[in-house]
Structures are given as C-alpha cells and as structure tokens.
C-alpha cells in the first residue's frame, strides 16, 4: 500500500472511476494499511500520497479499513490520529470529496469487547463515517443495535449491511426477498 500503483493498474482504476460515474455509481477507493503500519510520520505521508494519486485518477470517495487485524494496527487511538490527519490534510482541502469512511477493527457488536469504539467516539473527527455490520458479521440491522453502537461512536453508524453475503455458502447463489433491515433503524 505504500507504493504507487503501476501505470497499467492506475489506468485501469481511472477507467473504473469514469465508468462508475457514467452509471451513477459512487466509486469508493479503500486502503487497508493496518497489517503492517508503523504509525510514523513517513507512513502518514505514504497514505496521504496514495490518496493524492487516487484523487488525480478521479477518485472522490475514500475509505480506510482496519478490519480483520490484530496487534499494532488495531489501536483505536492510533487509527483515529491517522484518520484525523487525513481528514484535515486531504478531505477538507480537496474539492468535491465525499466524507471519509473508516472500517473499524471492531466492526460488529460480537467483537466489541473493549473500549475501542468509545475511544473512536471520543477522538475521531465527527465528520468521518464509521462502518458497522450489526450485532455480528452477518446480522439483521435493528434499532436496538444501532442505538448501542451510535452511543459509543458518538455518531450514526455507516451501515455495512452484509446481506446477502456468501462467505458461509460459496457454492450457492443467494436470491430472494430482503429481510432483516428494521425500518426504524435506518435513521437511528
């Protein structure tokens, strides 16, 4: 993630961004630095530079993912510091950019056993969207669940509704009516 995309891949991304815009799709480019981030100024600048490269390719929606990791990369205070830096030094300075999205390490209630979400709520810039899957990875979105997380992150969560997700049945095509989205939870 620290290195620029090779020219061929950069051209493909630029084409994807154009095609998405032509079809009224918001192309969100995400980076996942958590596995080996050092939390140094050098790494902050590396992420900032990658954002700049993507902006030059036409990307206007950005996300930083810290899901499915442990160790040094999973520290809420360090994540918030990096995200706040990107908010101030990039998102607020670039024209036409959507709000920054982050996927936290503890992105569902079953895995939220520490003060991680409370730290994000207290320290993360309120303009940054925080993704949330519900009470587990694949779960109904309920009013009770939304109220629980929103209190901790001190903002409405950015719902990552894992429906239908085929992680648990890769040999099936999931089709049929939607269920599990409480209409009262939409604006909770």
Model-predicted segments: where are they?
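Catalytic-core regions of glycoside hydrolase
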Residues: 69-188
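Substrate-binding cleft of carbohydrate-active enzyme catalytic domains
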Residues: 1-98
């Amino acid at each position: 993630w620290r290195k620029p995309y090779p020219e061929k891949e950069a051209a493909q991304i630029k084409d994807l961004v154009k095609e998405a815009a032509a079809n009224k799709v918001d192309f969100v480019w995400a980076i996942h630095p958590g596995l080996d981030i050092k939390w140094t100024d050098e790494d902050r600048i590396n992420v900032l530079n990658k954002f700049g490269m993507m902006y030059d390719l036409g990307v206007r929606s950005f996300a930083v993912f810290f899901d499915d990791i442990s160790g040094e990369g999973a520290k809420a205070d360090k994540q918030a510091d990096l995200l706040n830096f990107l908010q101030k030094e990039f998102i607020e300075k670039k024209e036409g950019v959507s709000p920054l999205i982050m996927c936290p390490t503890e992105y569902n209630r079953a895995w939220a056993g520490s003060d991680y979400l409370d730290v994000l709520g207290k320290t993360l810039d309120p303009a940054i969207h925080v993704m949330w899957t519900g009470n587990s990875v694949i779960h109904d979105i309920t009013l009770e669940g939304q109220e629980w997380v929103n209190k901790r992150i001190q903002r409405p969560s950015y719902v990552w509704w894992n429906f239908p997700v085929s992680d648990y049945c890769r040999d099936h095509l999931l089709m049929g009516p939607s269920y599990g989205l409480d209409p009262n939870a939409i604006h909770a």
